[in-house]
């Protein structure tokens, strides 16, 4: 992991600019352009300058950096950036060299990864008590390059994955404990939805497979029907998240002289692609679901962070995919702690969620007449990976040797071949 690599050409620059503004006590609006500090760090890392004064060595024109200098993450609420802003306030010397500043910002992801591990633990203990299978599934999830990469640069993607995993844990907890009172169901649902909506609304994508799994398990897998209050909690989380997100967007629009569409026309300047061309871009995205976001460019580095995965990492990914498919074929795939949820149904629901995002993301741009840039929607699907990790549990319970192979192989890959 190279903590001092250049910033990604797409999102890390505005994410960092947002962080710096938040640390200074302000909120990014559509009028804002990149600060001199952001421009300096980005340029100095790109040219690998060895000058410790490079960041403030000269005055830089924001319009020289795509897209015309706009700090375009104004659509994001500040919650997901708070860990990075806190690090900037407490530990980072603003006058320090570019390497030390970016290293300390990115190192916040170590703490976020530990929070994700805690959220994942809360999720997996809801469905199984078998430690070996849980350890194998945890290894598969932790080494997924699409997920792990979200914790390697300055972005709100990592906090969004933590929030979506915790949300999944809460909803599955609700399926297990059907006697929760209405207040203990509704109040947390409203709070969770509001927080996720103000963190990153795309984290709410986990609601789709959970809803499908809850409905289909009762209908097709001889499972008990979830209580009405559980259905209401899922709906309230989604509704509260949507309301919070739209309210924040309206607040930012009111504070800005420019609007979202003006800035978007600079980011996505060409319009519209033909349906066939847009579909080809989606085919390229499919490869990225397995190999990570650097696959389409045959690049040495990911767009978002890590080096392109080695053949051993890809081989381990194939092992995880095989376990996923085997679980879908087992006759008995109920989770031991929650028989009401069938792993086969959950697996199919996760696949439906992946495909829905794969289609919905470009379709939205296509319908609006915007040019679809060659970036992956995989980062929006990453919150579904922990749910996919639950699906492999029946395979590892049935084939214990396979579970040991996943654990030992995963540790070897992480230590020597990643």
Predicted regions and their residues:
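Interfacial juxtamembrane loops and adjacent helix segments
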Residues: 23-106
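Transmembrane-helix signature of polytopic, membrane-embedded enzymes
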Residues: 96-99, 120-143
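Transmembrane-helix motifs of polytopic, lipid-linked glycan transferases
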Residues: 100-127, 166
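Perimembrane helix-loop-helix junctions
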Residues: 176, 206-242, 330
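Membrane-interface alpha helices of multi-pass inner-membrane proteins
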Residues: 184-201, 206-212
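Membrane-lumen/periplasm interface segments of multi-pass, membrane-embedded glycan/lipid transferases
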Residues: 247-332
């Amino acid at each position: 992991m190279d903590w001092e690599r250049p910033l990604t050409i797409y999102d890390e620059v505005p994410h960092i600019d947002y962080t710096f503004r938040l640390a200074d006590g302000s909120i990014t609006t559509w009028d804002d352009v990149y600060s001199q500090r952001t421009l300096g760090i980005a340029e100095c890392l790109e040219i690998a300058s060895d000058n410790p004064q490079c960041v403030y060595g000269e005055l830089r024109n924001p319009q020289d950096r795509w897209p015309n200098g706009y700090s375009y993450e104004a659509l994001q609420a500040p919650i997901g950036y708070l860990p990075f802003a806190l690090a900037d306030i407490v530990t980072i010397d603003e006058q320090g060299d570019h390497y030390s500043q970016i290293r300390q910002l990115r190192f916040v992801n170590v703490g976020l990864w530990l929070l994700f591990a805690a959220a994942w633990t809360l999720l997996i203990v809801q469905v199984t008590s078998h430690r070996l299978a849980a350890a194998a599934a945890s290894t598969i999830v932790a080494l997924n390059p699409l997920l792990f990469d979200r914790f390697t640069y300055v972005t709100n993607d990592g906090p969004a994955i933590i929030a979506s995993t915790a949300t999944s844990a809460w909803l599955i907890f609700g399926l297990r404990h059907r006697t929760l009172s209405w207040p203990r169901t509704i109040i947390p649902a409203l709070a969770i939805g509001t927080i996720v909506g103000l963190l990153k609304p795309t984290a709410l994508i986990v609601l789709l497979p959970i809803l499908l799994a809850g409905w289909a398990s009762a209908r097709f897998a001889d499972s008990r029907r979830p209580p009405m209050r559980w259905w209401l909690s899922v709906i309230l989380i989604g509704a509260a998240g949507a309301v919070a997100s739209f309210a924040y967007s309206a607040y930012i629009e009111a504070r800005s002289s420019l609007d979202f569409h003006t800035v978007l026309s600079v980011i996505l300047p060409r319009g519209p692609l033909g349906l066939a061309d847009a579909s080809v871009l989606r085919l390229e995205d499919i490869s990225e679901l397995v190999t990570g976001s650097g696959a389409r460019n045959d690049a040495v580095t990911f767009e978002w962070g890590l080096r392109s995965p080695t053949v051993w990492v890809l081989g381990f990914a194939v092992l995880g995919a095989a376990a996923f498919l085997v679980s879908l074929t087992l006759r008995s795939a109920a989770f031991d702690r929650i028989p009401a949820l069938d792993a086969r149904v959950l697996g199919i629901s996760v696949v439906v969620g992946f495909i829905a995002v794969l289609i919905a993301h470009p379709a939205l741009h296509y319908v609006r007449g915007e040019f679809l840039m060659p970036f992956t929607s995989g980062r929006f699907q990453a919150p579904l990976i922990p749910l996919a990790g639950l699906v492999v549990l029946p395979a590892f319970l049935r084939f214990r040797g396979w579970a040991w192979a996943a654990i030992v192989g995963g540790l070897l890959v992480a230590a020597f071949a990643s």
